[in-house]
């Protein structure tokens, strides 16, 4: 399946734009952009970047987060638009639509398969990295924030922390992830069991539609507001900003980490984890990481459990002694800290007193690793022999891992159609993961092959008909094996995996708000075929 994708891409390189084509596109685009806006020539050179601009390559590379797509042979956009104000975004939409060019929207660039900045067809990139204003208002109900989509999660956490240590926001634990893709695709972090998904806290949004018009929640209609909470960015419009409700957290929270080798009964721990982690106190989130033996270290699977408890260490130690003795949690394993420090700890800073929260503001431009991710949802606990088979196989693979994220708690109380994100009532989610250091097709074949192996092993134990996937763990493979399906039929293949029954409503919304399918990418929501409208 992967080979087909690569061949598809390779063929597309030869069809990629000549520089003459890209000059024509630039000239036509600039003409349109000037007609639609009041931009001066001086400002224009910072906003619309042709391939010949000295800023083109640094701007493109700044938010490429997967090194597989950072090579010279990867197709490049004809133009990068770096808007400064809303009207630039409106003009970008109007002009790209007028010239019939595909517009890729990029906020933080963390799309695992690079859909926000690479494509086999002629395309433009709309880079929202200047859209990073955040306004926190603690007096609005229990606290709220307007956050522009080019901001990072780290910036949002930092701005909240500047005002209050007991206010927080439930979203991902990687601070460089962009708000635009993360929130529109669902979003979760280490408080998911207590507070649900990130989208469960979105109360308003502003969006530029396919006609270049700006809407807020009131004027966009509830259907579209429903769709952009989990239905993914890039299918419905350019989200400019989200308004989110903050949550309150205790002044002291606890984190702990327990690492076990196979000799220390790691298998028993992981087996029992499946029963405890999705059912225990919603204030407790325990993630398990299973990884193949890293070079020169051990010969068995590494098992790491990392946890956040929204409370004191004594309480969680007592709780675990009762519910999860296999963990063997001791007070010495626990660290009490503030919520913002817990984020630093999840970023792998062991001594959080020595790290300043300002580190959350670091965007780490132009830093990318070679990687591939896939996802799964588990509805029924695996047996010990089944887990054992997985452990045995994982021990033979290099650099491959599975991250198990417990669900339950708040996720169970919300209906699966409350937002576009459908996978709420599951036991846990798996992220299949492989990250490697070397460039080149050989390494890619080897490591992605490893990932496929664990994905295949898990087939009997994960959701079926369809096998579900998390949109924010973008996986281009899941739409490839389509036996020639195109348009709506192809969209239905990946669409049902990402959105389950919510796919039908998403298609209806898409057809209503963007009937010409201007906002599209390789895995966007399709419009209904004309004979079904
Ligand atoms: P990017 O800019 O690449 O956009 C992703 C998609 O959204 C693209 O299709 C893009 O077109 C679209 N889009 C972006 N901005 C838009 C806008 N303003 N309007 C409309 N469409 C827009 N997830 C999670 O839930 N919890 C986690 O803890 C993590 N952790 C994590 C760590 C790392 C290192 C990576 C690389 C990824 C994650 N993720 C994650 C996954 C992450 O949530 C997902 O990749 C998001 O889509 C990333 O959003 P960005 O804006 O950074 O990506």
From Swiss-Prot:
The keyword Nucleus does not apply. Its cofactor is FAD. InterPro entries: BBE, FAD-bd_PCMH, FAD-bd_PCMH-like_sf, FAD-bd_PCMH_sub1, FAD-bd_PCMH_sub2, Oxid_FAD_bind_N. Residues 73-249 form the FAD-binding PCMH-type domain. GO terms for cellular component: extracellular region; plant-type cell wall; plasmodesma; vacuole. Its main location: secreted. Gene3D superfamilies: 3.30.465.10, 3.40.462.20, Uridine Diphospho-n-acetylenolpyruvylglucosamine Reductase, domain 2 (3.30.43.10). It is found in: Secreted, Cell wall. Coiled coil: none annotated. Belongs to the oxygen-dependent FAD-linked oxidoreductase family. This is Berberine bridge enzyme-like 12.
């Amino acid at each position: 399946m992967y080979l087909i994708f690569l061949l598809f891409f390779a063929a597309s390189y030869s069809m990629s734009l000549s520089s003459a084509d890209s000059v024509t596109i630039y000239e036509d685009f600039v003409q349109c952009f000037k007609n639609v806006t009041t931009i001066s020539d001086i400002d224009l050179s910072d906003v619309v970047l042709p391939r010949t601009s000295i800023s083109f390559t640094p701007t493109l590379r700044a938010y490429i987060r997967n090194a597989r797509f950072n090579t010279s042979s990867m197709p490049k956009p004809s133009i990068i638009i770096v808007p400064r104000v809303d009207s630039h975004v409106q003009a970008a939409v109007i002009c790209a639509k007028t010239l019939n060019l595909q517009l890729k929207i990029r906020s933080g660039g963390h799309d695992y398969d690079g859909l926000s900045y690479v494509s086999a067809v002629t395309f433009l990139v709309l880079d929202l990295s200047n859209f990073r204003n955040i306004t926190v208002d603690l007096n609005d109900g229990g606290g709220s924030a307007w956050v522009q989509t080019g901001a990072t999660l780290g910036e949002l956490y930092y701005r909240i922390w500047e005002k209050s240590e007991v206010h927080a926001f439930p979203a991902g634990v990687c601070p460089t992830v962009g708000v635009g893709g993360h929130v529109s695709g669902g979003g979760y972090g280490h408080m998911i069991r207590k507070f649900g998904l990130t989208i469960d806290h979105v109360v308003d949004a502003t969006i530029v539609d396919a006609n270049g018009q700006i809407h807020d929640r009131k004027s966009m209609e509830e259907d579209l507001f429903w769709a952009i909470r989990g239905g993914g960015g890039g299918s419905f419009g350019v989200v400019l900003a989200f308004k989110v409700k903050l949550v309150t957290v205790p002044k002291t929270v606890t984190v702990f980490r327990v690492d076990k080798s196979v000799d220390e009964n790691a298998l028993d721990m992981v087996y029992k984890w499946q029963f405890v982690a999705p059912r225990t106190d919603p204030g407790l989130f325990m993630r398990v990481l299973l990884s193949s033996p890293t070079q020169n270290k051990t010969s068995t699977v590494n098992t790491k459990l990392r946890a956040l408890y929204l409370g004191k260490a004594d309480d969680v130690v007592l709780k675990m002694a009762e519910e999860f003795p296999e963990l063997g949690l001791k007070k010495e394993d626990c660290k009490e800290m503030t919520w913002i420090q817990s984020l630093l700890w999840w970023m792998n800073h062991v001594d959080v007193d020595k790290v300043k929260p300002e580190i959350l503001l670091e965007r780490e431009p132009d830093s990318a690793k070679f990687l591939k991710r896939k996802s799964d949802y588990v509805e029924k606990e695996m047996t010990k022999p089944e887990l054992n088979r997985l452990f045995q196989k994982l021990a033979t693979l290099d650099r491959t891992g599975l991250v198990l994220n417990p669900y339950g708690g708040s996720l169970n109380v919300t209906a699966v159609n409350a937002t576009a994100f459908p996978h709420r009532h599951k036991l846990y989610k798996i992220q299949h993961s492989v990250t490697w250091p070397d460039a080149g097709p050989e390494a890619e074949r080897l490591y992605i092959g490893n990932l496929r192996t664990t994905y295949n092993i898990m087939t009997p134990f994960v959701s079926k008909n369809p096998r579900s996937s998390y949109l924010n763990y973008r996986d281009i493979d899941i739409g490839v094996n389509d036996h020639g399906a195109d348009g709506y039929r192809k969209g239905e293949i990946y669409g049902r995996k990402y959105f389950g029954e919510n796919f039908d409503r998403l298609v209806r919304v898409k057809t209503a708000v963007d009937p010409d399918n201007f906002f599209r990418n390789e895995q966007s929501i399709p419009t209904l075929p004309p004979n079904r409208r």
